[in-house]
């Protein structure tokens, strides 16, 4: 039997966004299971009401009053789909905390997410932005995204191609942002650890010795903590920006003018380090 949804009016969201803003939702509910989504869909269509999905509440600046329904995705659970000598496939509920998920995968000997440690938010929000950090993007590790389609009223899996992942972009963010509710994400992770250390700051932090996944995770957490305060102590929206991508020709011109320019080769040209650019402008912090 599907658990009924509980709707609350004039619900304060201050504890549910990382800025701690005292926003008030016109209506609020929590989704504990994908089985509740047809009822949610019906409720919204009956009232012709806008929907705001809420995960961990980062990358979000809320108005004082949020019209319509705010639905917080709280779907939990881990399901081991496949295990071989080389890899595992795990399906994880959209409401699981992202950082806790990364820590747990490393503890269980499943590798590939450690460079994405300490990114705020939930598992279900991660594909929307195609989160990435220190040489790894989510799309490198995803094999399916489980969704509820508000257009058809059906639940289905989308493969990575269907998700239209781009640089900090996806189907869910810019192409059809109001069509799907992500209910779970399936990852393909390695059983043997191979470190991804292209990011110079990470290499410097770890040195030249052989490293473990836990050491990479710890180093990433240390670097991120130096750059950004803990939202539990100082409210912030998290770290989100795009490194500008320029042509090889423009990169060569810029490198001539600014020999210390930090950039990385990219399939479409060169990716300039936004952090370095911000620092050079005197705007760090």
Residue ranges and their predicted role:
Residues 8-9, 15-18, 60, 155-285:
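Phosphate/pyrophosphate- and phosphate-bearing ligand-binding catalytic cores of soluble enzymes
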Residues 2-145, 149-151:
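Anion-binding (especially nucleotide phosphate/pyrophosphate-binding) glycine-rich loop
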């Amino acid at each position: 039997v599907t658990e009924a949804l509980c709707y609350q009016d004039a619900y304060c969201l201050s504890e549910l966004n990382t800025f701690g803003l005292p926003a008030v939702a016109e209506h609020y509910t929590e989704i504990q299971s994908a089985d509740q989504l047809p009822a949610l869909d019906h409720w919204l269509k009956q009232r012709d009401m806008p929907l705001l999905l809420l995960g961990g509440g980062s990358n979000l600046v809320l108005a004082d009053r949020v019209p319509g329904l705010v639905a917080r995705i709280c779907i939990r659970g881990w399901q081991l789909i496949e295990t071989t000598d080389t890899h595992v496939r795990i399906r994880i509920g959209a409401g699981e905390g992202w950082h806790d998920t990364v820590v747990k995968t490393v503890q269980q000997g499943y590798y590939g997410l450690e460079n994405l440690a300490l990114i705020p938010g939930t598992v279900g929000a991660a594909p929307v932005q195609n989160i990435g950090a220190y040489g790894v993007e989510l799309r490198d590790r995803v094999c399916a995204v489980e969704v509820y389609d508000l257009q058809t009223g059906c639940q289905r899996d989308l493969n990575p191609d269907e998700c239209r992942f781009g640089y900090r972009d996806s189907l869910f963010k810019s192409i059809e942002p109001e069509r799907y509710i992500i209910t779970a994400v399936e990852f393909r992770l390695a059983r043997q650890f191979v470190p991804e250390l292209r990011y110079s700051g990470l290499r410097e932090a770890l040195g030249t010795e052989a490293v473990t996944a836990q050491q990479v995770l710890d180093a990433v957490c240390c670097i991120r903590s130096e750059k950004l305060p803990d939202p539990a102590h100082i409210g912030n929206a998290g770290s989100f920006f795009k490194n500008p991508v320029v042509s090889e020709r423009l990169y060569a011109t810029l490198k001539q003018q600014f020999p210390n320019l930090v950039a990385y080769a990219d399939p479409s040209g060169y990716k300039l380090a936004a952090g370095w650019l911000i620092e050079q402008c005197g705007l760090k912090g």
